[in-house]
Amino acid sequence: GNPNLPGHVLLTGRVTGDKWAVSDGEVHGGARSIGAGGLPPALQAQVVNDLSRPVANLDSPLAGNQPRWLEELAAYNRGFASRHRQVAELEARSRTFDTAYRMQTAAPEAFDLTREVADPATRSLYGLDPQETRSTGTKLLLARRLVERGVRFILVPSVSVPGGRGDWDTHTPAQVREALPKLALACDQPLAGLLTDLKRRGLLDQTLVVWGGEMGRGGPGHMNHNGNAFCWWLAGGGVKPGFAYGATDEQGFAAVKDPVHVRDLHATILWLCGLDHRQLEHNGVGFDSTCRVAHGMIA
């Protein structure tokens, strides 16, 4: 990874016109969606909801005195740590300060899309001109820049699209008819552009792209939450292209052929990232959440 940039970035907000509209700061799922889970707190997500200010307070008011102030703070923290046990959160906060200092020079360049969006070919590839694809395309273009610069994990939520109801939380036929075509349009070209761009830059083989949601639809009219049948797609990162695994019944209510448990999916993603799920264990609140496999690897 790049020590001058965060290892985990969440790109939220929406692009309207030529500006990155600031979201309200809320992330679906709350802190669990951006936290580090069982990993050190320093690995939680850096939330970017305003491209003009990707990192809050990035400009230092201390100017030339900043290195001295940071060293004094580090010395104080080391002294505190030497007198107290179990100071993982303090260590994580200290590393966060160090990263923030280094980001003052690296982040402005990484998040600057000026030259990218001036290229007509890039604008066409990511769909930056049509209103329907501009928001997703801009964030995926930024995600590609972060991949190039060594950011290890980037999350791009599929947010609502302009014009009426436009999110994935559809529970009536009317909502599906209104939202689904817009959402598909917003995602299709930008995602294809991202994969094309990563491949031609030689980055796709070492970058795993995952697209999916948290559930399918079932019940009367296919309008209810359904955790028994839904699909994800993976590309790059060693995934075999053109490979499909599993199938649902004719109604899409249940997986009936080669069903994949979510733990299988997690294990597969970890394996593609070079991690052995059997070596990972997190003792959470009264339970052992080791990533176990029910049916083995799927890719």
Q: Where are the regions a protein language model picked out?
A:
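Ligand-binding pockets and gating/stacking loops
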Residues: 1-299
